[in-house]
């Protein structure tokens, strides 16, 4: 719903014409029950724009495939300026992908879009999916937007190992720190009861560097939100940190 709200602004930083259709009444109900400080979705707007720009930059550098793991209601294949011959693969649970495919049945993606139903928590199923999805790729970007914070440390480590293969050039991810994890699990205890924040490494980016990854670009959400003029007034001092 936050993407739909942003898209309706005259100064929108991105346009997602399909967001409202996908969110529906359920999405509006969720927004109505979140804490007031996060209700305007500044963090989601910032994250969306950061990832949009990172994908565009990767494509300019020769990215030939995008894998969106736990793709959810993402509509980038329909709204970004993408090469028609780019292969974009969405992976998520069967029921979610089936509903999404039905809702978007009359829409045409701007690239070669495929969807694969897979339980990414199943190591064998995940590896089989990656083998198929990355076949023929040479510079793939893997996106795990809004996923890692719900995983255990061991699951993140296993996913990292699975993605360390020659076809993968970039891993675009987001994660929270221990302080945000504690605050979110407390403020949104009811909403997060079935999916609490779990992964929040004490050592931040060093966690991934210790697993063999090299940091190319990083930006805090509050910093991006301030740059985009979306950070709530009460939080603006954070943008200077």
Give residue spans per PLM region.
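A short, conserved alpha-helix within the catalytic core of class I
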Residues: 113-115, 123-126, 150-166
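Short acidic, glycine/proline-enriched helix-loop-strand junctions
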Residues: 81-87, 191-194, 213
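Conserved beta-strand signature within the Rossmann-like core of class I S-adenosyl-L-methionine
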Residues: 141-143, 159-179
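Conserved catalytic loop of SAM-dependent methyltransferase domains
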Residues: 216-239
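Short, glycine-/aromatic-enriched active-site segment of Class I SAM-dependent methyltransferases
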Residues: 178-195
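A short SAM/SAH-binding and catalytic strip from SAM-dependent methyltransferases
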Residues: 138-154
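Rossmann-like AdoMet
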Residues: 1-67, 71-118, 123-132, 136
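Short alpha-helix
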Residues: 195-223
